[in-house]
Amino acid sequence: MQTYGNPDVTYDYWAGNASVTNRSGRFIASHAAHTGMIAFGAGSNTLFELSRFDSSLPMGDQGFVFLPHLASVGIGFDEAGVWTGAGVVTLAILHLILSMVYGAGGLLHAIYFPDDMQKSNVPQARKFKLEWDNPDNQTFILGHHLILFGLACAWFVEWARIHGIYDPAIGAVRQVNYNLDLSMIWERQVNFLNIDSLEDVMGGHAFLAFAEITGGCFHAIAGSTKWEDKRLGEYDRLKGAGLLSAEAILSFSLAGIGWMAIVAAFWCSQNTTVYPIEFYGEPLNRAFVIAPAFVDSIDYSNGIAPLGHSGRCYTANFHYIAGFFAFQGHLWHALRAMGYNFKDLRAKLNPSAA
């Protein structure tokens, strides 16, 4: 992270991952523990919503967030095609168990395993050391992330093809084969809000799976080949010398997360194919309250939905707000990565204090 020339900088507890910047073992520990927290939140909130679910009322009127996600991918339906929550308890408890596994993994990496992967006795583990200004090291780690993302996309495509997902056009779960039309996929980059075909949705995921796995394999091996060094030369400005740092990579990550969150917010607020009305409620209107926000297009103040809002409203606004702050974090860390010291700004605004 940016130290402004201070070699003895220390970080307080609230500094988050800054304290593990150069300790890859502890970096993994924090991520494993964070994954455990996410799994626990998913499992516990699913059980909470299931305990409040009233089968005599439309799910979309009850202000749920977790149950609609499960229902939209075809989980919880009985053989007659009625959503009863079948299997949801098992899935929620599985998440709770996995949260303990991830938490234990975080503790192992924090207490037992080396704090830096370079100290590991396992040669394969040492490859995942953190050298923030080394593009070969960073591209190796990036490649493995892309492969895992691609496998997740491929798994979702196969789930829709074999098990089936919910199609609001027919009001039932059906098997969906992907439509790998590249012209359609290209067009949907800017016209995704109106997508009304599950085949097109799965086609996009299939394309992403191919692109991410292919790109991941390239990144995982390209940084260590003699061919690349021969064609591009050793580590220089063309390969990012002087550009990469922990702060810069954090800013890149926050920009990507922020963009995805904003896209998800608009998509959830308007699209009724991926986010069916039966589960999420009616599409939202855009409004300016204290800040730009999404508001329900119909009245949900019937005492059923929490705080009188639909699950669509909660989901869209949470993603929008999270995306906004992720962008602010991106700008903050990008400026710091470029060497800007925010203490200078304080001095300029209040010269007498300086």
Curated annotation (Swiss-Prot):
GO terms for molecular function: chlorophyll binding. Coiled coil: none annotated. It comes from the Bacteria. It is a multi-pass membrane protein. Signal peptide: none annotated. The chain crosses the membrane at residues 27-47, 88-108, 140-160, 201-221, 248-268, 315-335. Its cofactor is divinyl chlorophyll a; divinyl chlorophyll b. Its main location: membrane. One of its GO terms (cellular component) is photosystem I. InterPro entries: PS_antenna-like, PS_II_antenna-like_sf. Induction: This transcript is too unstable to be able to determine its expression levels. The whole antenna complex is most highly expressed under low light; as the light levels increase antenna complex levels decrease. Thus at least in this strain the amount of antenna complex is controlled mostly at a post-transcriptional level. Transcription decreases upon iron starvation. It is found in: Cellular thylakoid membrane. GO terms for biological process: photosynthetic electron transport chain. It holds the Pfam family PSII. Belongs to the PsbB/PsbC family. IsiA/Pcb subfamily. The antenna complex consists of divinyl chlorophylls (a and b) and divinyl chlorophyll a/b binding proteins and binds more divinyl chlorophyll b than does the antenna complex from high-light-adapted Prochlorococcus. This low-light-adapted strain contains 8 pcb genes. The antenna complex functions as a light receptor, it captures and delivers excitation energy to photosystems II and I. The Prochlorales pcb genes are not related to higher plant LHCs. This is Divinyl chlorophyll a/b light-harvesting protein PcbF. The lineage of its organism: Bacteria, Bacillati, Cyanobacteriota, Cyanophyceae, Synechococcales.
